[in-house]
């Protein structure tokens, strides 16, 4: 029975270790931004569901509201640049949508800083959505840097995955505080996270079977990439989440503008750094695939899908011409 099983996710923040060396201030603020986003999602949903208006909402409106929340997160642990999350397997379909939308929300805040051409030093780009007052009482914007996670998801019985108190030593005494995760399914999730490059989500074959059944018309977002490894095309939910327009074309156009464009800029900037650019190239493939899946699931004709491909290709071409021509000129 699925209600006896727990989904466990392990997510790692890409580039964080290197960022702590080159720009520790931004690394710290990005980590804080992740925590703040999770906290605000949790608190916002409590406020919504405790409001007088909520009880009068239709079931469809309530369902839509919860898609953007984190109501399925039974456990969520933030440790340094990683996240550990647990959810009941009966909520599998809603959990992957909520997780995907969380990743979209976190990524979008920073990606909007890269919609224009990136200067010679990426650290010269300020994060326009964040500011603080320094010791001289000047308002400052920290450097912008993408917040992208790669993750692994697995599943096991509740007895196999244990969220238990952390044992800490304080003043030479043991005190249980916070949570830790142990269990073979968690170890499997950690191993799955390392399967590929870029901000991707990989899951076990056991979890994939449950998702393919529960996702119904959206089951195509789960694809097999190895014998026992599947990938969740979470960028499909990015198209849904970034615009929320009733017209699918408007959502696709918005994803091309606000997701594809900044990642193209980042790929162009890191083009000569093979170890870094591979992550953005994989992200570009993932965005492309997510947009086409969205079009297909929304019953686009073959002619309409070809038009979407043309729009993405034109965006790709214009961006790369802009980058390479400017490189030639310099």
Predicted regions and their residues:
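Catalytic/regulatory signature loops of cyclic-dinucleotide turnover enzymes
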Residues: 155, 184-207
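Short, glycine/acidic-rich hinge or "gate" loops at secondary-structure transitions
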Residues: 48-60, 116-131, 210-211
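Intrinsically disordered, glycine/charged-rich C-terminal tails and inter-domain linkers
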Residues: 198-330
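A short glycine-enriched loop-to-beta-strand structural element that forms part of the catalytic core
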Residues: 73-82, 118-137, 142-163
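Flexible, glycine/charge-rich interdomain/linker segments that couple
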Residues: 163-180, 198-214
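Catalytic NTP-binding/metal-coordinating core of nucleotidyl cyclase/transferase enzymes
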Residues: 1-114
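A broadly used, surface-exposed interaction patch
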Residues: 85, 89-138, 165, 169-172
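Short, glycine/acidic-rich beta->alpha junctions
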Residues: 145, 183-184
